[in-house]
Amino acid sequence: MIALVNFTYLIAMLGFVIGLKFLSSPSRAKNGNHIAAGGMALAVLATLVGLFYGVEISVVKISLIFIAIIAGYLVGKRMSDKVEMTEMPQLISFFNAMGGGCAMLLGIIESRLDDAPSTSNLSLMWAGLIIGAASFSGSIVAYRKLSGKQKDKKAAWIMWLSRILLLVFIAAPLLYVYDLIPQELELITILLSILGLVYGIIFVLPIGGADMPVVISLLNSLTGVATALAGILYDSSIMIAGGIFVGAAGVLLTLLMCQAMNRSLLAVIGGKFKASKGPVGEEEEIEIKTTSFGEVATKLAFANKVAIIPGYGLAVAQAQHLCKQLQSLLESKETEVHYIIHPVAGRMPGHMNVLLAEADVHYDILKEMDAVNDEMSSYDLAIIIGANDVVNPAAETDE
């Protein structure tokens, strides 16, 4: 039976890999999502079968497990069916918070079951607990920010408190192992989980709305890391593989988005922008050119090739349907229209693609920034919608 369960895990992992591969292609993304979800369902089923045959477990406990699975499915499906496309970032943040919360609870439960863990198990347990707690509370703050219920908060005490908490997270396991603090494992575990929750809150609080795509990606990767650590603790190959997939993909995506913004990850986390590298003390007066609806309409009427560059402002204003109307009008006059997408456009990774897809904009006319940078001179007109930050020439040098 163990061999069958492990073989089923292998099939589930293969489903994860194929699903991730398909997600990189717009035409196969939907199938990729279904394949990955099928792999997860298969992994859950294999775990239940292994649990039923591997240990003596009461019918009541099995029933509770099935009730929890069904309840989670029904709640998740209702939330997904009810949410609007424009609210998808909030939903992703909420679901990610649930993953982090699960990792935190696993650490607390493990401290109750094993009151004398080995040093390695203790390190894994507390690392997963702290990362999961920070991911949970940080994702909740991100959810509130995306919903417009939480404003940015920048203060010197936040930076100092975060540094102190990091020192506590490093020192606590060492002090416990060398008997320099009371050997109350369960109590210390709960205290660390509370401090992890506090760290997650102050981690996200200073970060501005335009940087939320990076934050969401980073929080997703943290949840993946917490899951992988829990998998090592419980000797679960499927948890390890799933956590590594999520963690690695999240880290790579985070770094790519930071590179596209010409900012370091530390600058994003700190909510800081460096000052412009222009000459100090010199001022240049530039006359701002304004335009009118009539002038823009005239330029559009005579343009043969138009670029629409959407950004964070379009996502906030939910103007994707108006863009689609403009696109249809231009295409009726045989004007070629392309949407040029910056890696961090929108409110989460890939959010701009989702918004435009909701407005029935075909993927074929979506172009990535790097693919068209050298061809911008071929466009007769570029319409920038809430994306001044990504087209500003100073973005090439300022951080």
Regions inferred by a protein language model and the residue ranges of each:
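Central hydrophobic cores of alpha-helical transmembrane segments in multi-pass inner-membrane proteins
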Residues: 11-21, 40-46, 68-78
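Membrane-interfacial segments at transmembrane helix termini in multi-pass membrane proteins
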Residues: 245-303
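Structured cytosolic domains appended to multi-pass membrane proteins
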Residues: 284-399
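Transmembrane alpha-helix boundary signature
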Residues: 47-66, 78-87, 104-119, 143, ...
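Structural signature of hydrophobic alpha-helical transmembrane segments
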Residues: 1-14, 50, 56-72, 121-136, ...
